[in-house]
Amino acid sequence: MNKKSFGNKLVASPYIVWSAIFIIVPLVIMFYFALTDNNGVFTLANITAIGKYKKAFGISILYAAVSTVITLLLAYPMAYFMTKLKISSQRMLFMIVMIPMWMNFLIRTYSWITILSNTGLINTFLQKIGLIDKPIKLLLTPGAVILGMVYDYIPYMILPIYSVMSKLDKSLLEAAEDLGSNSFTKFKRVIFPLTKPGVISGITMVFVPSVSTFYISQKLGGTKTMLIGDTIEY
């Protein structure tokens, strides 16, 4: 074994250990519990009973898909707008995007209760200006759950798209303009294909936690909104 090969393995060893502890081991534990009963005896009952939870699976995938699409539609133009600003302004907006991620996830989600409840900010404001006579049911609804997902996970969509978009070769955009491309054609033929890796990363980073979340659905959706994460917790 040469020194370069040994050095590469040495550098990669922390990642290998991290992957083994936080990815491989949890998967092994999950398969163990899936194939055993409460006494540790081998059984396929847990696998065959998965059909009972198809509704929870369906709702989880639907909510995650809707929230991912909404997040993408909001994050993509936001990331594009950020790249058009001065470096100092980009850094400021980057910090604004990052700050919510520094806050506790539970606090971020719980704050929406004070906004969406019958006595929350939205209903109180609408009643004071005379648009409604009684509170609108905003909390404990599917819309509240999707809103919570979008709010909590939108930074994970913005960051990879912005990272890719900020590194676009400006000469390619100029060449497209010189060849007579309008804004839509330039986006379709140049910008979007080159930023697709960031979009795919963002979709993955939003969809996966959305489909498995349970705290957002509990606090903003109530017991009537049972996602697969809630089913596993119970």
Segments predicted by a language model, with ranges:
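Interhelical loop and adjacent transmembrane-helix boundary motif
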Residues: 3-7, 44-56, 214-234
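Membrane-embedded alpha-helices of multi-pass transport/permease systems
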Residues: 24-32, 73-78, 106-110, 119, ...
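Non-cytoplasmic
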Residues: 30, 157, 198-233
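Periplasmic/extracellular loop-to-transmembrane helix junction in inner-membrane transport proteins
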Residues: 32-69, 135, 234
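N-terminal signal-anchor/first transmembrane alpha helix
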Residues: 1-29, 91
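Transmembrane-helix boundary motif in ABC transporter permease subunits
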Residues: 1-3, 9, 66-98, 113-114, ...
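Membrane-interfacial helix termini and adjacent extracytoplasmic/periplasmic loops
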Residues: 109-150, 184, 220-224
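Transmembrane alpha-helices
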Residues: 14-23, 69, 99, 151, ...
